[in-house]
């Protein structure tokens, strides 16, 4: 019995050492060396303090800020530990009610909008944490932000364009705007 148990335990502890200790340490070390920002969560700092991550959306409710997609996380919006497949089915009446409420709220907050409400402003992403919106959704909000900030709409269009990330190849993905980065650029523009 001991003849069989000793090699089995040796292999078990060796694999635990390799897969649970050595491999994570090597991968973490390489990530810290090659991609230090991403390895730390892609944090964004303002005045030396972390104020968010470019990977997780945030709630912006003031009229002078661009708003992102609604969060689908439970209890607290954009709560990463609570992220899950939380979207309702298209056939669920609760989804229809939530979308109607969001459309009504957005139209009240954006009375000068001249196009239908972009779909991503009223529907959550699969994770409920998406930090991006389409350039069209950002452009749709420009009249409200321009009025609240007393800025010309043309300047905000340029700011949206400057903060639009385009895919490397035009047929892989869509252009997106990171709402946190856009709002930080807007604040920096107002300060400067």
Swiss-Prot record:
Tell me a Gene Ontology molecular-function term this record carries: ATP binding
Q: Which InterPro entries match?
A: KdpC
Q: Where in the cell is it found?
A: Cell inner membrane
A single GO cellular-component term on record? plasma membrane
Query: Where are the bilayer-spanning segments?
Result: 11-31
Pfam families of this UniProt entry? KdpC
* Keyword annotations of the record: ATP-binding, Cell inner membrane, Cell membrane, Ion transport, Membrane, Nucleotide-binding, Potassium, Potassium transport, Transmembrane, Transmembrane helix, Transport
As for membrane topology, the entry says:
Single-pass membrane protein
Q: Which HAMAP family match?
A: KdpC (MF_00276)
Describe the task this protein carries out: Part of the high-affinity ATP-driven potassium transport (or Kdp) system, which catalyzes the hydrolysis of ATP coupled with the electrogenic transport of potassium into the cytoplasm. This subunit acts as a catalytic chaperone that increases the ATP-binding affinity of the ATP-hydrolyzing subunit KdpB by the formation of a transient KdpB/KdpC/ATP ternary complex.
What the record says about family reads: Belongs to the KdpC family.
What does the record note on quaternary structure? The system is composed of three essential subunits: KdpA, KdpB and KdpC.
Do you know which PANTHER family this protein is assigned to?
Answer: POTASSIUM-TRANSPORTING ATPASE C CHAIN (PTHR30042), POTASSIUM-TRANSPORTING ATPASE KDPC SUBUNIT (PTHR30042:SF2)
Q: Can you name this protein?
A: Potassium-transporting ATPase KdpC subunit
This chain's source organism reads Sodalis glossinidius (strain morsitans)
């Amino acid at each position: 019995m001991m003849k069989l148990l000793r090699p089995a335990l040796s292999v078990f502890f060796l694999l635990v050492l390799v897969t649970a200790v050595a491999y994570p340490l090597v991968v973490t070390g390489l990530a810290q060396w090659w991609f230090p920002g991403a390895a730390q969560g892609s944090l964004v700092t303002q005045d030396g303090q972390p104020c968010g991550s470019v990977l997780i959306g945030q709630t912006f409710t003031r009229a002078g800020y661009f708003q992102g997609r609604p969060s689908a996380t439970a209890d607290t919006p954009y709560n990463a530990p609570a992220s899950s497949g939380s979207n309702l089915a298209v056939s669920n009446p609760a989804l229809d009610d939530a979308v109607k409420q969001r459309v009504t709220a957005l139209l009240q907050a954006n009375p000068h909008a001249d196009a239908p409400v972009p779909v991503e402003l009223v529907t959550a992403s699969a994770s409920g944490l998406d930090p991006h919106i389409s350039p069209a959704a950002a452009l749709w909000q420009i009249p409200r932000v321009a009025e609240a900030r007393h800025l010309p709409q043309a300047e905000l269009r340029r700011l949206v364009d400057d903060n639009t990330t385009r895919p490397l190849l035009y047929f892989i993905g869509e252009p997106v705007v990171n709402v946190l980065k856009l709002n930080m650029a807007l604040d920096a523009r107002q300060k400067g």
